[in-house]
């Protein structure tokens, strides 16, 4: 055996030992790794200097919108009722009937758990730009 062959054998043995040591360390601390991932999983897709990442685990109808007026929001429709609104109009059950909620939490829950935007009622398209309903919609945006 020459010296080069012995050096390669020693180097290969050291690499294999380091790999096995790392594998054992991961095996030994696996429960700590799982606990860390559960605790800090919400920060996985946060804004960072590396770019903007979108968390697709939660539905957000505003993810694909870049215009602030096009983003869906909950607005005070009447004195004590809330509705989902954007520049496209109000979320509605049918024409001229926006979906109304008694509190803000129910409105937010409806916006972010449905998974899709259904019927939209736009008073500006139906009654014209000068109507009171259209002015109310625009005042919320």
Curated annotation (Swiss-Prot):
Q: Which residues lie on this side of the membrane: Virion surface?
A: 22-141
The membrane-topology field of this record reads: Single-pass type II membrane protein
Task: Pull one GO CC term from this UniProt entry.
Answer: viral envelope
Protein location: Virion membrane
Its keywords, alphabetically, are: Disulfide bond, Fusion of virus membrane with host membrane, Late protein, Membrane, Signal-anchor, Transmembrane, Transmembrane helix, Viral envelope protein, Viral penetration into host cytoplasm, Virion, Virus entry into host cell
Q: Share the record's PTM remark.
A: Contains two intramolecular disulfide bonds. They are created by the viral disulfide bond formation pathway, a poxvirus-specific pathway that operates on the cytoplasmic side of the MV membranes.
One biological process term from GO is:
membrane fusion involved in viral entry into host cell
Give the primary localization class.
virion
Output the InterPro entries linked to this UniProt entry: Poxvirus_A28 (IPR007664)
Question: One Pfam match, by short name?
Answer: Pox_A28
Q: Where are the transmembrane segments?
A: 1-21
- Respond yes or no to whether keyword Lyase is given for this record: no
Family, as annotated: Belongs to the poxviridae A28 protein family.
* Function, as annotated: Envelope protein required for virus entry into host cell and for cell-cell fusion (syncytium formation).
What is this protein called in UniProt? Answer: Envelope protein A28 homolog
State the organism named in the record: Fowlpox virus (strain NVSL) (FPV)
């Amino acid at each position: 055996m020459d010296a080069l062959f012995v050096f390669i054998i020693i180097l290969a043995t050291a690499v294999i030992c380091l790999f096995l040591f790392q594998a054992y360390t991961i095996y030994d601390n696996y429960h700590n790794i799982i606990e860390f991932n559960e605790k800090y999983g919400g920060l996985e897709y946060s804004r960072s200097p590396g770019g903007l990442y979108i968390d697709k685990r939660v539905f957000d109808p505003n993810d694909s919108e870049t215009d602030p007026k096009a983003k869906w929001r909950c607005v005070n429709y009447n004195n004590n009722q809330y509705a989902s609104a954007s520049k496209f109009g109000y979320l509605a059950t049918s024409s001229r009937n926006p979906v109304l909620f008694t509190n803000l939490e129910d409105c937010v829950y409806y916006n972010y758990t449905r998974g899709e935007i259904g019927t939209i009622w736009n008073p500006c398209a139906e009654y014209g730009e000068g109507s009171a309903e259209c002015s109310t919609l625009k005042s919320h945006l």
